[in-house]
Structures are given as C-alpha cells and as structure tokens.
Amino acid sequence: MSNKPSLSYKDAGVDIDAGDALVQRIKSVAKATSRPEVVGGLGGFGALCRIPTGYTSPLLVSGTDGVGTKLKLALQLNRHDTIGIDLVAMCVNDLLVCGAEPLFFLDYYATGKLDVDVAATVVTGIGEGCKLSNCALIGGETAEMPGMYQDDDYDLAGFCVGVVEEAEVITGENVAEGDVLIALASSGAHSNGYSLVRKVIEVSGVDVTSSNEQLDGQSIQDALMAPTRIYVKAIKALQDTLGSSALHAMSHITGGGLTDNLPRVLPETLAASIDTNSWQFSELFTWLQNQGNIEQSEMYRTFNCGVGFVIVVPKDKAEAAIQTLNDAGEKAWKLGEMVKREADAVVYR
C-alpha cells in the first residue's frame, strides 16, 4: 500500500453528498409543477413526458436561454429567490411567440462550490416560474466544477419544450399594413442589458447594496431584481378569446430591445411604426438613462424600456385584444401600427 494520502472526490472540490442533499431538497419543488403528461419523477437518466391530448398534428417547440449578468447582481445583493423565475420566463416567453403552450422545463446549474441553500433557493424560484407557466420541471443538472468558477459564483441555463397545433403556428406571414401593435408592460429590465446596468451602477457611484433610493415605489434593489414577467396565461386567454388566426405575430422583447426583436417576426416589406407617446419610461429606465447618459436609440436597442412583449393583430381586433389582456392581469395598450417599409424595420415617432 502506498504511503501517499488517499484522495477523494471531495478533496478535489466536489461534494457528492451536497449534491444528493440538494436533490432531496428540490424533489418537492419539481413535484409541485407536475402536469398529467409527466411520467415518473426526478432522478432518472431521462425525463418522460407525453404530448397533451387534444392535438391533431402537434409540433414540439424548443428553446434555451439564460439570465446573463443579472446573476452578478444577484450574487452582489445575495438575492437568489427570483432569479429562477427569470430563467423560466426567458425560455417560455420565447416559446409563446409561435403560439406554443409550454410543456416541460429543465435547468442547468453550474458552480465552483455547491452551496445547497443557495441552489435550493434558485431552484425554488424555477419551480415558481414553472407554476406561473403551467410548465413541468422534469429534470436538470447540477455541476460542481472547482477551478471553472469562483467558489460562490454560479451560472444558469434553462431549456423548455412546448407544443403547438401545426395549423395554428404563428409565423408573422399574415402581418398586413394597418395591423395594430399591442404592448404588454414589462416588470422592469427583465433579464437583458444587465452588463450596461452594472456599468451604469459603477459610473453612478451608487452602492446598490445599501442605497435607500426609491424607484417606482420600491427600493432600487427591488427595482433592479424584479423578476421577468411571464406572459403565458395572458397569451392563452387571448388565443382562447380571439383564436390563434387573429394573432398575426408576436415578439418577446429581450436583448436588442424593440429595435432588434420586432423585425425578427415581421415581413420585409413592412415596418413597425412605434408611437413613443403611448407610454412613459418607468423611473428605473429614466434613472439608467440619466445616470449613464445613454442615447435614446441605445436605450431602445438595449432595454425593453417598459415593453416586455408585443402582439400584432388586425385593426378590428385590437380593442378586444387589449381588453382581454387587461382582464388577464396585464397592462396592455396600443403601441403603434404596421406601415409600408421605406428604410428601417422599426420607426419611432
């Protein structure tokens, strides 16, 4: 027998027992999100899920995303309870764009040293996001990787699968001149532009960990960490009321803002004419713009600026759509209209 010390995985920085403890902590979180289509529970090599009944020719829709450097702010403020909601929102809102119903969700959590309490808090937030989306949390991966990350740092990725009837896929091809753009209010900066947010905080000299500054009736910490709004239930209400055929296009306003996200779903011959007087920047976006001396065009191309989601409908359906969305708990308004494109795909007026 060698005189060398016997090494274990824990000596290398990987605590299997901590990983097992986390799985036990989050089993109830996953169970609370279950849908009838889910087969089995956590812990298998693969998660099983049936396609919901009622579909004639179902298409599966997939998406993956993260929450960017909002994680750095979460670590700085030691606030991990809502970042999981952000993760789910970024994925499920993307799926909504083609008219899909979110079905199941998986997460990836990577860290330098696994803190079971922090990880459980994050996953609890993921579970909350899944409940808000009627989406089952059916699996995930926790990776403890010493040397890849600083001990307390962690990164997140989410993966979501949804389902949509093939004949009801929303592609944007039916968008026509005169169609109305309807905005759904965001809850804040959502999960995009946080590298610029953090730069603004740096140049402003504000200590966000202790500042008593108020924005939009809440602390600056709450304003910056407000979870991304999930639009699943509102869009479902709209589909049930108007029918998918009346929804000519939808866009999730993420990185790139209105400027870059609207063109992704619009015909090349048309432009979105945005009425900038139809809403006002919240105190959060005004604060960011003033503290960072950010140009208006840069604001529109970096942040959602208060518009988290956009729906394009025929003019004669706009009033009913806005009413339905407001009744579903959203703040909706007419953002603009579709016009012939002359140059830019998005025109601010």
From Swiss-Prot:
GO terms for MF: ATP binding; phosphoribosylamine-glycine ligase activity; phosphoribosylformylglycinamidine cyclo-ligase activity
Known EC number: 6.3.3.1
Biological process per Gene Ontology, one example term: 'de novo' IMP biosynthetic process
Cellular component terms (Gene Ontology): cytosol
EC supergroup of this enzyme: ligase
Principal subcellular localization: cytoplasm
Cellular compartments annotated: Cytoplasm
InterPro entries, per database record: PurM-like_C_dom, PurM-like_C_sf, PurM-like_N, PurM-like_N_sf, PurM_cligase
Signal peptide: none
Keyword Nucleotide-binding listed: yes
Entry superkingdom: Bacteria
Catalytic activity annotation: 2-formamido-N(1)-(5-O-phospho-beta-D-ribosyl)acetamidine + ATP = 5-amino-1-(5-phospho-beta-D-ribosyl)imidazole + ADP + phosphate + H(+)
Swiss-Prot/TrEMBL keywords: ATP-binding, Cytoplasm, Ligase, Nucleotide-binding, Purine biosynthesis
Pathway membership, UniProt: Purine metabolism; IMP biosynthesis via de novo pathway; 5-amino-1-(5-phospho-D-ribosyl)imidazole from N(2)-formyl-N(1)-(5-phospho-D-ribosyl)glycinamide: step 2/2
PANTHER family assigned to the protein according to its UniProt record, in alphabetical order: TRIFUNCTIONAL PURINE BIOSYNTHETIC PROTEIN ADENOSINE-3, TRIFUNCTIONAL PURINE BIOSYNTHETIC PROTEIN ADENOSINE-3-RELATED
Sequence similarity: Belongs to the AIR synthase family.
Protein's recorded name: Phosphoribosylformylglycinamidine cyclo-ligase
Species, as recorded: Psychrobacter cryohalolentis (strain ATCC BAA-1226 / DSM 17306 / VKM B-2378 / K5)
